Amino acid sequence: MQKLYIALVDTPGLFAWMIRRVIKINYIHVALSLDEEFRESYSVGRRNPFLPFFAGFEQENIYRIHQAFPTARYKVYAIDCTEQQKEDIAFQLRECYRHRYQYHYCIIGLFYLLAGKPFYQKNHYTCSSFLARLLEENHVLTFPKHFSLVTPKDFYELEKQEVIFKGPLRELCLRANPCPSVYPYLPFGIG
């Protein structure tokens, strides 16, 4: 049995505050990692943690996120998958990253989400809708609704979850790299 890692993220900011008001939990972003240290993790979100207006598919860098949001908190789950599922998901994530500028954040979909109506525009996702679709298509998880209606709250409420970390992002960064004087200088995309 292999593992995939889902991170629920609590960050500050106006957009985060609005999402928090709608979904009623603090964790407003979700990312998927192929490893426990989040060296290779992906999501649909900000292309640069410092600029909220440009969003799409990206490889996340926990060190850059920590620089932008020093008070960010993470809750990390390990979920079971087969070796073949993990290989397939890794391939799909890397292909999406290779074509990352073809994937965009689905602003319009947020209004449909609020209305409870499924909506899909090609290559446009929220962080949770992308992850829900990927995990469902690879038979790792299923949700009782259309992938476009899945929110971080649905990941928060997963029944089969093994919490492996909950706390400040700084602690997760230190677990991944115990030399804190180094990580703020890592270039974007490495982690």
Where are these regions (language model features)?
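Cysteine-nucleophile amide-bond enzymes
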Residues: 1-191
